[in-house]
Amino acid sequence: MAARTAFGAVCRRLWQGLGNFSVNTSKGNTAKNGGFLLSTNMKWVQFSNLHVDVPKDLTKPVITISDEPDILYKRLSVLVKGHDKAVLDSYGYFAVLAAKELGISIKVHEPPRKIERFTLLQSVHIYKKHRVQYEMRTLYRCLELEHLTGSTADVYLEYIQRNLPEGVAMEVTKTQLEQLPEHIKEPIWETLSEEKEESKS
């Protein structure tokens, strides 16, 4: 009990002493102005016996330029399929909002639904006239994104795939733009006519 009261007294003295707390800095110019101590390295702010050390020069993310050219996609087709219409509508709305935030042009259309029916016996040991019909309805949403870079497509796809709801499947089809190979750039008939002229002479 005596130790507790002694510890409480020490804590109170330390808490009251925080008001007269001072900071010594060896580097840079410091100026004290009405409860604020500004330094070139750190900023110290005091509000009612509470101080926070905040680094003044926060490191900004550095944008790196790579030598490798980015992939270009002409079209990115995302086919989402599921059994619940409300879930697909909600997910389509989410995907459109995410695309608009990234500045991507997007079109959404709804392909016709696919219905599979299975006709089975009610039980294994029963007459043929006692049957049950099961039905599986698969609904689709197709998201068409056009004119994307590879990095933008990767970021967008990762974001929408991480937030894919349960019971929903996704198929992604990418149409990539490629440079025309060197052997196709020149028309073949021009080289053939030159070879014929050389063989004649």
Curated annotation (Swiss-Prot):
Major place of localization? mitochondrion
A cellular component term from Gene Ontology for this protein is:
mitochondrial small ribosomal subunit
Q: Which UniProt keyword terms apply here?
A: Mitochondrion, Ribonucleoprotein, Ribosomal protein
- Record-linked SMART domains: Ribosomal_S10
Origin, by domain of life?
Eukaryota
Q: Does the record's keyword annotation contain ATP-binding?
A: no
**UniProt key word Transferase:** no
Query: Where does it reside?
Result: Mitochondrion
UniProt similarity note: Belongs to the universal ribosomal protein uS10 family.
* Complex and partners: Component of the mitochondrial ribosome small subunit (28S) which comprises a 12S rRNA and about 30 distinct proteins.
Q: What is this protein called?
A: Small ribosomal subunit protein uS10m
Q: Specify the taxonomic lineage.
A: Eukaryota, Metazoa, Chordata, Craniata, Vertebrata
Which gene is the coding source of this polypeptide chain? MRPS10
